[in-house]
């Protein structure tokens, strides 16, 4: 499982930071979080395959998070996409997409499914055998969502228990693995009788644009998240600006990471005012003096991060 930071800037792009977009590669599939302008070109410089993007998660409808959608949707159509593509976002996402695609002429023949998510309560929006995706309402100047991707691990077969019960490799063991019970020597044996608890799966949260929310930290802790991607638009001397614009500072993001219990926090959505990051680095050094175990990274465009 791997993250690729396609764009790590904020409202205005710079020479070094494109508009926000992050891909997550899992089990041969690409999950895209936000799709700012220039996303499809950033993808060219990575190993991300646009044709393997089946789900796009939009945090909110500000232009810097959505204006890459029409180009990306058109390009995969040119490449022959026929498979449906799912787009998740807050209220008005369907109207936004309709308006964008009504500008100019587009040849998009594959199905696009739009799912509008409540920005009032947390929801599990996708559930499969291998992963789950949750939304969480955050506080910004427009309806906004955070997202959490969590890997689902299956129970592990306990060979010691299998041998002790006298179950041989064959049809009975296969039925147990498939979730069915079997009868052996007059005793009913279930999958729970021969398995160990599942290992902890990888869990990563993405804040989108938001003020710092302790409730989001508690949600991440509840889901046992290990990695957090959190916006850090400003350094801590710009706290007033952050409050006025409903964004977060470096210190805000680090504090939410601490409260959530994650091992790693990756800071993104960096304001265009920062040509260099010494102010960010100073804030991190100060925070880590009292919290040395937290792994902190500042995202850069095209940076990759393996999730283990």
Swiss-Prot record:
Cofactor(s) for this UniProt protein: Zn(2+)
SUPFAM superfamilies tied to this protein: Metallo-hydrolase/oxidoreductase (SSF56281)
Keyword annotations: Endonuclease, Hydrolase, Metal-binding, Nuclease, tRNA processing, Zinc
* Binding residues annotated for Zn(2+) 2, in chain numbering: 64-65, 209, 269
EC number per UniProt:
3.1.26.11
Instruction: List the NCBIfam families.
Output: PRK00055.1-3, RNase_Z
For this protein, the record's HAMAP family field holds: RNase_Z_BN (MF_01818)
The subunit field of the Swiss-Prot or TrEMBL record says:
Homodimer.
State what this protein does: Zinc phosphodiesterase, which displays some tRNA 3'-processing endonuclease activity. Probably involved in tRNA maturation, by removing a 3'-trailer from precursor tRNA.
Protein name per its UniProtKB record? Ribonuclease Z
> Which source organism does the UniProt entry give?
Methanococcus maripaludis (strain C6 / ATCC BAA-1332)
Q: Which gene encodes it?
A: rnz
């Amino acid at each position: 499982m791997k993250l690729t930071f396609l764009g790590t800037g904020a409202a205005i792009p710079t020479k070094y930071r494109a508009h926000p977009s992050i891909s997550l590669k899992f089990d041969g599939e690409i999950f895209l979080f936000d799709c700012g302008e220039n996303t499809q070109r950033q993808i060219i410089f990575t190993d991300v395959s646009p044709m393997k993007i089946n789900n796009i998660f939009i945090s909110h409808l500000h232009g810097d998070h959505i204006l890459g959608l029409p180009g990306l949707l058109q390009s995969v159509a040119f490449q022959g996409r026929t498979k449906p593509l799912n787009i998740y976002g807050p209220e008005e996402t369907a109207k936004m997409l309709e308006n964008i695609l009504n500008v100019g002429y587009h040849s998009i023949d594959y199905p696009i499914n739009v799912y509008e998510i409540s920005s009032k309560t947390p929801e599990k929006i996708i559930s499969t055998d291998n992963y789950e995706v949750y939304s969480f309402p955050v506080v910004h100047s427009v309806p906004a969502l955070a997202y959490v991707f969590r890997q689902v691990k299956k129970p592990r077969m306990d060979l010691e228990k299998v041998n002790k019960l006298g179950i041989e490799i064959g049809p009975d063991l296969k039925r147990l693995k498939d979730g069915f019970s079997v009868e052996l020597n007059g005793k009913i044996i279930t999958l729970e009788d021969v398995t160990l608890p599942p290992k902890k799966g990888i869990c990563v949260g993405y804040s989108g644009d938001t003020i710092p929310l302790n409730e989001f930290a508690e949600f991440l802790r509840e889901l046992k998240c290990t990695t957090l991607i959190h916006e850090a638009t400003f350094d801590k001397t710009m706290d007033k600006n952050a409050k006025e614009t409903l964004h977060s500072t470096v210190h805000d993001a680090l504090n939410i990471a601490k409260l959530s219990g994650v091992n790693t926090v990756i800071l993104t959505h960096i304001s265009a005012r920062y040509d260099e990051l010494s102010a960010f680095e100073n804030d991190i050094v100060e925070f880590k003096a009292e919290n040395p175990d937290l792994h902190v990274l500042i995202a850069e465009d095209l940076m990759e991060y393996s999730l283990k």
